[in-house]
């Protein structure tokens, strides 16, 4: 099945927003929100080498461009998020037998599709104080926009619930995520795979507007890979990079190093984030 989602672009007057609420090039989620009435737009690209898809059996180099996200500040403590992408292209280097490899419907060495859209809500539960970190929760649902016929998607709906913690110590921002993921089985509609999701990131300001950042982020499948539903296995990756903020615009870049045999051996990412005033909360 093939589905497409078009994002609507919005324009308004620039204003500042909490820098801690902007993650790129990292994916570990900060508990701080972007602020009431603000809109955050981010866009960029990823290039990941030697990534493996266990459901389709494809292995190759993945280009995602653009990777986009929109966040809406619903109040001072709540934020609504939409994340996805318009074009994912996999250059296939190797094919292996897999549960859904017989469903592949493309020829040649390249296959492409859209990115699965993620719809999420983030709520800051506790504000940060000198003696206490900020705490929040995030609930996210991944929609099945990418098709299994193209070998990139799984045609499953996945749900994540995470606890978010963040603390600034002098010039260093520490953020941690921990939660549960409920992932659909692409081969059976009556089965799911439960995983433990986690992330830990560090951002250090080295001069005005400039930060160096790094993280470890992934998910852990407590069951053996042979027993777990395909596509719900353990994943993990490290990201390192930097970002520069000027007024309400931030540019970023980083490298990606996979920590399992299914993750990319190496990758790069770069993008831009813009926060502006979008609407007034009554």
Predicted regions and their residues:
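Bacterial N-terminal signal peptides
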Residues: 6-16
